[in-house]
A protein has these predicted regions:
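Conserved Rossmann-fold cofactor-binding substructure of NAD(P)-dependent oxidoreductases
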Residues: 40-56
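Conserved mid-core alpha-helix of short-chain dehydrogenase/reductase
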Residues: 45, 88-96
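Conserved NAD(P)H cofactor-binding loop of Rossmann-fold oxidoreductase domains
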Residues: 60-69
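Substrate-binding pocket helix/loop in short-chain dehydrogenase/reductase
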Residues: 70-71, 78-80
């Protein structure tokens, strides 16, 4: 299959790319590097990316940002960072990308444990993650041409422990192999509308 991976250079993305590249053709899209550049917060950039890439079999989004800050310090503009990037960025990848997926193709979006188990300073990120979960379940009901859509939601991954463990006291780090398998389940399985949770109650 021909897979397009946005965020393929990140902590999770590079491991996902390494796995799928063994058996599939991979196109990496990133804001500053990759085979093609894209800013998922800009729908025009998304359209240009798809025009450049052409028809594909699967789209994986492992990109998007949201503001982490104390609730009482978050401004309206702070919330819009996550809404424009991680939420609408992924929504627009689906909205626009459906015309570039071959029949039976799939979308795999990415969220995280904050949708179910938020921690301090993550109000905006948790809100965005929850919105994506609802979007995936609803969009799965209406996608045409046998297209599928799922979202992988991971906990604190092993490769990011040093950077984020202070925010997640008592959380058990998730092995990267387990996280990768979430993407494999979405891309190579037959399910749709699924929230593939890669954590066990923290």
């Amino acid at each position: 299959m021909k897979l397009l991976v946005t965020g393929g250079k990140g902590t999770i993305g590079k491991k996902v790319v390494a796995h799928f590249s063994k058996t599939h053709e991979i196109i990496i899209a990133g804001r500053t590097s990759g085979d093609v550049t894209v800013d998922i917060a800009d729908s025009g950039s998304i359209e240009a990316m798809f025009e450049s890439v052409g028809k594909i079999d699967a789209i994986l989004c492992i990109a998007g940002e949201a503001k982490w800050a104390p609730f009482n310090s978050l401004t309206e503009d702070d919330y819009y960072i996550g809404l424009r990037s991680k939420l609408m960025g992924q929504v627009n990848l689906v909205r626009i990308g459906q015309d570039y997926l071959n029949t039976g193709g799939s979308f795999t979006l990415t969220t995280g444990i904050l949708a179910d188990y938020p921690v301090v300073m993550t109000t905006s990120a948790a809100m965005v993650n929850g919105g994506i979960h609802s979007f995936v379940k609803a969009a799965a009901l209406e996608l045409k041409n046998e297209l599928r859509i799922n979202v992988v939601s991971s906990g604190l991954v092993e490769d990011a422990v040093e950077k984020y463990e202070a925010y997640f006291p008592g959380h058990n780090p998730i092995p990267m192999k387990k996280v990768i398998n979430g993407y494999v389940k979405s891309v190579e399985g037959k399910g749709t509308g699924e929230i593939i949770r890669m954590y066990d109650n923290c």
